[in-house]
Amino acid sequence: MDLIPGFSTETWVLLATSLVLLYLYGTYSHGLFKKLGIPGPRPLPYFGNILGYRKGVDHFDKKCFQQYGKMWGVYDGRQPLLAVTDPNMIKSVLVKECYSVFTNRRSFGPLGAMRNALSLAEDEEWKRIRTLLSPTFTSGKLKEMFPIISHYGDLLVSNLRKEAEKGKPVTMKDIFGAYSMDVITSTAFGVNIDSLNNPQDPFVENSKKLLKFSFFDPFLLSLIFFPFLTPIFEVLNITLFPKSSVNFFTKSVKRMKESRLTDQQKRRVDLLQLMINSQNSKEMDPHKSLSNEELVAQGIIFIFAGYETTSSALSLLAYELATHPDVQQKLQEEIEATFPNKAPPTYDALAQMEYLDMVVNETLRLYPIAARLERACKKDVEIHGVFVPKGTVVVVPVFVLHRDPDLWPEPEEFRPERFSKKHKDTINPYTYLPFGTGPRNCIGMRFALMNMKLALVRVLQNFSFKPCKETQIPLKLTTQGLTQPEKPVVLKILPRDGTVSGA
């Protein structure tokens, strides 16, 4: 039997040509860094280097840093990524050349209405939305929002007390995830939910749908392999964000907005109201104000950016305190000195707590929620003697920077003293980037820090964390999406002095 099909010569030529073209399509960009003399791992056709992410982006970047030094080139599919760790280059990318060259993040496929979200908007649209939203996150506005967040701090204590009374180990993500969800949905959408005790609430269910993400999701991989599919998906109204959830939040915001416009008693100082106010400001050019679609997109991106980051950071913080009882005790002493007899925390006093700030900063050094920062290069440019072609994505590997032994002695150790007043001024600001830096840094940085600090103070006023047999020591991480524990952080919760305040 003939094993080779009896195709005509023309068919064989067509088949061979197709295979060659397919190969060239999947590899044509892969010679870029070799031409530029920039080292890096060898890419595979279509995949590039993404298979190296299977153990986590942090593991991959650390390996590249050890092997290639301060700069290397990799490929996500066919997309070239230039990783830089030199502080001067980082400053050029994130600050100096932000408006002219490195304005935008990498475009990730069909976004639908979410292209209007601050984190995803580009160029002039991003500038306009950022300008409109910036007043929402001033210290004055956050101070006005503080009572809302404080209410959920009390609810957090109440929920923890119930768990502590059971005498069983507690999964930190469940508790802090509920707190984070409650704060975000309350401030961004004006709804009050106790998500730990109401997991079926549609706000909770739709928020969690938004947060399901995997780098190896087939849909996402198809966009990496074949980016030309993006406009086709846009036309078909297929996006990276679940349509049902976006529709739910659109209807909810419309209903909430109408309610607040007709009944002034329902108004309060929160992110939603501040965005509505910006829409209706007489001083605002109506062509520059937020549209209803943009208002919804900001609310959704606040959930996307705020829920996972805060809950993961607090879980990791609790782990470090449980495994460093001396740090936990010292922090509790500062809390007691600042708020005697378990007095309710205040915005101004929280901001002045030096050791609390040190503990939070060191946690975000060890566990930066975003393992990388990315900026797309809009035009050919040379930065500090390195030519960066248009279309290249420049990556700042934050996880690697935060654990570089040349910058941080014994970087794997948890040492809040690194951020004491004595040492803080010696830290190069372009080597510590938990919230990014420059014009496109995290707009919600102050909000996130206030949120975390309030939760930590309220919990430590009433409880102490201790490891238990279910606690994974040492902790292992996964960074295929955001930095989080490979296994949930499970700890024992011990009430202090047998009493719980504010619960």
Curated annotation (Swiss-Prot):
SUPFAM superfamilies: Cytochrome P450 (SSF48264)
Annotated TM spans: none
Cofactor: heme
Name of this chain's protein: Cytochrome P450 3A29
Catalytic activity field: an organic molecule + reduced [NADPH--hemoprotein reductase] + O2 = an alcohol + oxidized [NADPH--hemoprotein reductase] + H2O + H(+)
Organism annotation: Sus scrofa
Domain of life: Eukaryota
Membrane disposition: Peripheral membrane protein
